[in-house]
Amino acid sequence: MNRKTIKTICLSFLVILIVFYPPKIDALSHDWIAVPKSKYGQQLWDKNSVQKNENGFIRVLSKFIPKSTTEITQDILYTMDVNCSGKSFRDVAVGTKEFNEFKNEDSAWKDPNGDKLILGVIDQVCAFIN
């Protein structure tokens, strides 16, 4: 094989790679909705992520932004299930850099126990879905 043939093969391979391997892009951008703030920070939920699963529970992406952020206290990203009839929730996964970074294997249903931020998410998400 001569140089021209090798060059043609390499360029053809590069073109095929570019055409058939598009960059990863998120299908939907986030549409963050804030719940009333608390003394600890702010909680938001993503309107574009709301899904009703086969059990009738609602899955939503949520983000907690602490009042003051440092290397130790930073934004926390949650994938959470909401039980509208029971006013309860469970954290399915959590992360700091991306959603679903760490799966929660023991995701038991929890009572918000008066937490205004979580209650705000539950109330708003349930009103949005109905």
Where do the model's predicted regions map?
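A general, composition-driven signal for non-globular sequence regions
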Residues: 1, 17-18, 31
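Bacterial N-terminal signal peptides that target proteins for export
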Residues: 2-10
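Bacterial N-terminal signal peptides
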Residues: 11-20
